[in-house]
Amino acid sequence: MSFTPGKQSSSRASSGNRSGNGILKWADQSDQSRNVQTRGRRAQSKQTATSQQPSGGNVVPYYSWFSGITQFQKGKEFEFAEGQGVPIAPGVPATEAKGYWYRHNRRSFKTADGNQRQLLPRWYFYYLGTGPHAKDQYGTDIDGVYWVASNQADVNTPADILDRDPSSDEAIPTRFPPGTVLPQGYYIEGSGRSAPNSRSTSRASSRASSAGSRSRANSGNRTPTSGVTPDMADQIASLVLAKLGKDAAKPQQVTKQTAKEIRQKILNKPRQKRSPNKQCTVQQCFGKRGPNQNFGGGEMLKLGTSDPQFPILAELAPTAGAFFFGSRLELAKVQNLSGNLDEPQKDVYELRYNGAIRFDSTLSGFETIMKVLNENLNAYQQQDGTMNMSPKPQRQRGQKNGQGENDNISVAAPKSRVQQNKIRELTAEDISLLKKMDEPFTEDTSEI
């Protein structure tokens, strides 16, 4: 007697988007052509919706009974503990729970910068004696094949399982017995749940077993849930942040060496492609401010595009189309002042432009824009005037601070004893005078 996964009369499928027979339908394994095939006969070599790989990737000519397991983290091995790894299917006894996982190398796609990026592989399960390696014995060393079986299964004989006919049988969502530990860096396709990382298997097993006992008390045919962890969004977010180097807990520090590398990278670009910032200032990118380059002052010259006020100014910047079609352009050949005299001289041209950016008071942030423009237009004139009014005296090389400052000081007259406020000892004459001052005054009545 051959077994058909998901065909047990009293079985109940998990929650989700259910089709007519109560089994989830997966877009990557459903047959759109609805070609009728004979049950019990092996499906013809035909591609699934995701098997047609114009940009690389191997072909999956057979339909798996279960949804796939997708890798989302590079460098992680696909493996299960002994006796684990066979998905649960209503109507299939434990003696037939044997087979292999087949690695499907998905296609590559073209990124925005023109590079090809290969998608990480996805694994599909096939029962022993079915699928692309139906004729291979259990345990054969094959690249892209991982063999799994339950402890009750006999791996020396093929599983008595029919091939899936996509016209009548739809894929079953992959679930595992309680306590199964999924490979780290993988998630079950369509479940939004990932493998447990630090949570103990025994704890998950005890919870699952208690839940299973309650389930058996209510309904003996309820499908047990897999021992997987909650949403993997946090894990994916941490991986992305680590890949981009933007870990919020450890802000990236810019050292002198990295700042020098950033500055050199900016200066290696053509002049019209440079973007000044903290590491490469406006003056380093475009030179000093003057009549021909009259914008920028104060903090904006130090921070460049990193200045908090710059984004609102960037709203005024013309697009490439407005620059070419809305400006007066003039091509002029200029003298090449770069390079050595013994090197071959290159022809250097300047595309000079003259245009205007028009806006009115209805523009969003108009007051702020006007404030920033007034602070930065011709700001170099105010800075030069301030420097000319109070020039800082420069110290000669080799001269210590304070030395030479007393050369131009006029010599004043020496102070008196009172000004000097010096303490001296009393003489005998001084003591005699003090005693007379203490005696009472008597009027002299003697006649002359």
From Swiss-Prot:
PROSITE patterns: COV_N_CTD (PS51929), COV_N_NTD (PS51928). Pfam families: CoV_nucleocap. Residues 266-384 are annotated as: Dimerization. Residues 61-190 form the CoV N NTD domain. Signal peptide: none annotated. Residues 1-55, 158-231, 383-420 are annotated as: Disordered. GO terms for cellular component: host cell endoplasmic reticulum-Golgi intermediate compartment; host cell Golgi apparatus; ribonucleoprotein complex; viral nucleocapsid. GO terms for molecular function: RNA binding. ADP-ribosylated. The ADP-ribosylation is retained in the virion during infection. The keyword Ribonucleoprotein applies. The modification Phosphothreonine is found at T174, T427. Residues 29-38, 45-55, 383-393, 399-409 have a biased composition (Polar residues). RNA binds at R106, R122, R164. Residues 9-22, 193-223 have a biased composition (Low complexity). Residues 259-384 form the CoV N CTD domain. Keywords: ADP-ribosylation, Host Golgi apparatus, Phosphoprotein, Ribonucleoprotein, RNA-binding, Transcription, Transcription regulation, Viral nucleoprotein, Virion. It is found in: Virion; Host endoplasmic reticulum-Golgi intermediate compartment; Host Golgi apparatus. Residues 52-194 are annotated as: RNA-binding. The modification Phosphoserine is found at S167, S191, S390. Homooligomer. Both monomeric and oligomeric forms interact with RNA. Interacts with protein M. Interacts with NSP3; this interaction serves to tether the genome to the newly translated replicase-transcriptase complex at a very early stage of infection. HAMAP family: BETA_CORONA_NCAP. This is Nucleoprotein. The lineage of its organism: Viruses, Riboviria, Orthornavirae, Pisuviricota, Pisoniviricetes.
